[in-house]
Amino acid sequence: MQWIRWFSEIGIDDVPLVGGKNASLGEMLRELTPLGVPVPDGFAITAEGFRHFLRANSLEQKILALLATTEGVADIEAKSLAVRELVLAGTIPPDLAEEIRAAYRDLSRRCGEAALEVAIRSSATAEDLPGASFAGAHETMLNVQGESAVLDSVRRCFASLYTPRAIAYRNDMGFAHDAVSLSVGVQKMLRTDSAVSGVIFTLDTDTGFRDVVQIDAIYGLGENIVQGRVGPDEFYVHKPTLRQGFKPILWRRLGTKELRLVFDRAKSRHDNRLVPPEERARFCLTDDEVLQLARWALAIEDHYSEKRGQPTPMDIEFAKDGSAGSLFIVQARPETVHAARHGLTFKTYALTERGAVLLEGLAVGEQIASGAARVIADASRMAEFRPGEVLVTESTDPNWEPVLKQASAVITARGGRTSHAAIVARELGIPAIVGAEDAMTTIANGRVVTVSCAEGETGHVYGGALAFRTEDVDPESLPSTHTRICMNVGDPTRAFKLAMLPNDGVGLARMEFIFASWVRVHPLALTRYDSLPADTRVEVDALTARYADKREYFVDTLAQGIATLTAAFWPRPVILRFSDFKSNEYAHLTGGAAFETPEENPMLGWRGASRYYHPDYKDGFLLEVAAVKRVRETMGLTNLKLMIPFCRTPEEGKKALAVMREGGLVRGEGGLEVYVMAEIPSNVILVDRFAPLFDGFSIGSNDLTQLVLGVDRDSVRVAPLFDERDEAVRRMCAQLITGAHAAGRTVGICGQAPSDYPEFAAFLVEQGIDSISLNPDAVVRTKRRVAETEARLAATFSVAAPTGNTPGPARATPAAEVAVGV
């Protein structure tokens, strides 16, 4: 055949012949199906077939004349309509039409059907190229059946080369309109409308973090994801440990999935139908299916990376056939947003003032922007939009892109992180908040708002134009240090971004943040559920509805938070401190009031190690242990280390370690390291007795200062006396460093002082501390200060030259591995 190529005959080098989409389908069918990646069969109508159609209808010069100049959105829309009307009025030449009919009959026979249902997709010759993202610009027709319907759909695909979005994008990218041609793919249609479909990215779409596979899934046909009509289920899988054979599903987030797009065969049209509440309340993919999709995604990424000779993150579409119950890959293309960004330099954003929160939703990106809100109900009113405004609408599709390019930020009432609005916002580098259900009614037209996506997974819309600061960070420009520079991290949703800062790992991962924001239930409210008051049981039931075993809710949810944070810094060490709430803070968790007795001074009361072995909390601590065990053993994240807080005596340390052993965590087994916070004078005075029990010490400067100076750090009246730089505190730190090193143990610090006082960080370096763990916003400036101090010491004492930022001993110490920020 002259104008037909079967997928099995084409590959990634055939983009000029069959376009990026079809070339990729052929590549996968030929090269990856033998490796177990299933791709539905089909054929491509070549770009030369499209040009044959244009010539046969004398359209080439007419189209070029219409598109010779385009000025503004309205002009592009008018000329787009004129060109598409010309194409749709054209006739497919008989020789081309017969080849298409014959190929369709052959495909139907191959699939055992008289007249096969097919998906018909446009595939531009400039599509899916690095730096060019035509995805969504051209037409796709689903559930097409019969020769006449196939021919009609092919003509509609031809016309879609001239949609307003496609014309505008070619203008922006500098592609001549006659230099880009179109191929059409005809592929076996899966019964996805009765099952599941979705998208896969082999990186985190918000940050570009490349060690994860992100999977979004919905019921029915996949157009609802792209159009942002529903909130999908979301899954993250860790690539490195998946390759090692583990099952590292880092997190699962249940989407709204309120609509299912189906094909109504009686009416020959696609309809959105409401999904029953019981289906919405469960994930649409099983864990085994998530892991299978992630493995296929790795195989696809590996293949394309080898083919291109460079790492190539991928944007993949999958579908589940409702008839066979099997998963298939239906598209794959190189990811273009993060691939187009070069170098390691990145910008950080932070609000410097606060305002009233008007609205919340899913944050897309890490930026902050302000502007007047423009609330637009539908695309017919796009002309009302003015450059620099904040677009507020239900959802967007490719028709909105001329407006999106002028927006300072985007807010949509529907959609998830892989919706059209989210994808384009990332591409344009503007903040977007999606899935903000009340956006259309909460934000008044013309009101000045600030859109912040710099505060974790939740995006906030504030009233007014709030002040914020930015900082450009180039890790390559920062000096190397002997002292390992780590970070204090609590929010797992910020971990992927924070891991891009120059660092040697996490010196303090705060479990209590995950307790409060992810788990939200007191552990004993789950182990002793039957003793709860009736109204509290209702609250607990709402949070644990998907879990038959309420204990499993706690373990699973806590493990997801820990795993996400730990995976972000893999393989650098992450030191997780077991829960260190005070009794009044535990009481604020759902169900907590039933298990916490009010204390006069919770700061010095029942906290830290003393809770872990006590009969009144031991069951809760064992759930913490079970979550950690799952992260290390099921997910394979063995870079996770542990830390015991507020351990008053060596005997308490032994008891806490014994309970950990009871729960299956044994120091030394599987490389497990356990550290202890040095925040009580007894930890310093008895350093020689604590050292045999633990792998290292972490100075908690906040509590240590409080207890050395006898100052309640929560008291306003004595607050001026609280100073980590006091000579007594400095002497305690120096004594601990000397004693720990003498015992063959390492010392770090994870308290607030080095972040607030650069001179205190310099003092610690002078004392020989092994690592300093800082708040993320202090990493860059403190790293520079530490390098200056080390250079001064080197000049004075002839210390060896810096060794860089890779994990390793800070200086010649005994056999124990150097602790990261502990």
Please report, for each region that a protein language model flagged, where it lies by residue.
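N-terminal beta-alpha lobe that positions the nucleotide/phosphoryl donor
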Residues: 1-185, 194, 280-288, 292-296, ...
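Acidic, glycine-rich flexible loop/linker segments
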Residues: 323, 337-339, 367-390, 394-509, ...
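Conserved short loop/turn motifs at secondary-structure junctions
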Residues: 12-14, 45-51, 84-88, 174-175, ...
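Conserved catalytic alpha/beta cores of large enzymes that bind or transform nucleotide phosphates
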Residues: 212-313, 319-323, 354-370, 378-381, ...
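Extended active-site and interfacial segments that coordinate phosphate-rich ligands
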Residues: 134-168, 192-265, 330-362, 406-413, ...
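Conserved metal-phosphate-binding beta-hairpin within the catalytic cores
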Residues: 136, 309-336
